[in-house]
UniProtKB/Swiss-Prot annotation:
<dbReference type="InterPro" id="IPR003482">
    <property type="entry name" value="Whib"/>
</dbReference>
<feature type="binding site">
    <location>
        <position position="90"/>
    </location>
    <ligand>
        <name>[4Fe-4S] cluster</name>
    </ligand>
</feature>
<feature type="region of interest" description="Disordered">
    <location>
        <begin position="23"/>
        <end position="45"/>
    </location>
</feature>
<dbReference type="GO" id="GO:0047134">
    <property type="term" value="F:protein-disulfide reductase [NAD(P)H] activity"/>
</dbReference>
<protein>
    <recommendedName>
        <fullName>Transcriptional regulator WhiB2</fullName>
    </recommendedName>
</protein>
<dbReference type="Pfam" id="PF02467">
    <property type="entry name" value="Whib"/>
</dbReference>
<dbReference type="InterPro" id="IPR034768">
    <property type="entry name" value="4FE4S_WBL"/>
</dbReference>
<keyword id="KW-0805">Transcription regulation</keyword>
<keyword id="KW-0963">Cytoplasm</keyword>
<keyword id="KW-1015">Disulfide bond</keyword>
<dbReference type="GO" id="GO:0046872">
    <property type="term" value="F:metal ion binding"/>
</dbReference>
<dbReference type="GO" id="GO:0003677">
    <property type="term" value="F:DNA binding"/>
</dbReference>
<comment type="function">
    <text>Acts as a transcriptional regulator. Probably redox-responsive. The apo- but not holo-form probably binds DNA. Affects the localization or efficiency of septum formation. Complemented by whiB2 of M.tuberculosis and whiB of S.coelicolor.</text>
</comment>
<keyword id="KW-0004">4Fe-4S</keyword>
<feature type="binding site">
    <location>
        <position position="93"/>
    </location>
    <ligand>
        <name>[4Fe-4S] cluster</name>
    </ligand>
</feature>
<keyword id="KW-0411">Iron-sulfur</keyword>
<dbReference type="GO" id="GO:0051539">
    <property type="term" value="F:4 iron, 4 sulfur cluster binding"/>
</dbReference>
Amino acid sequence: MSYESGDFDRVVRFDNRLLGSVSHAPHIDTGSTPTGAAGRPQLSLVPDSFDVAPEAEEDQWQERALCAQTDPEAFFPEKGGSTREAKRICQGCEVRDACLEYALAHDERFGIWGGLSERERRRLKRGII
């Protein structure tokens, strides 16, 4: 179902009481059909279709990441612990670039992301690497 911008400027009323505006609720159908008791419009809180959220599409790379099938402690070692195993796994991962891009965009401060430690990512952001 497509919506026009004017579709969400209506106010929802129930028994002549103001319930609020639907300006930010595209999933609420205030159409006149079907009607409920006493001919009042029936509200539906269920959308006609489900769209994949943009964030979900962007994060689908995580399902293909090799680290998803590995012990997370390798990627989040204790202070002073070795990061060698995690970096080795990252080298063969098909989503390494997407992982690093995500970590840089979301300012991930802990763990190995895209084959780089937090310190290495900071240096990369500053242009040192």
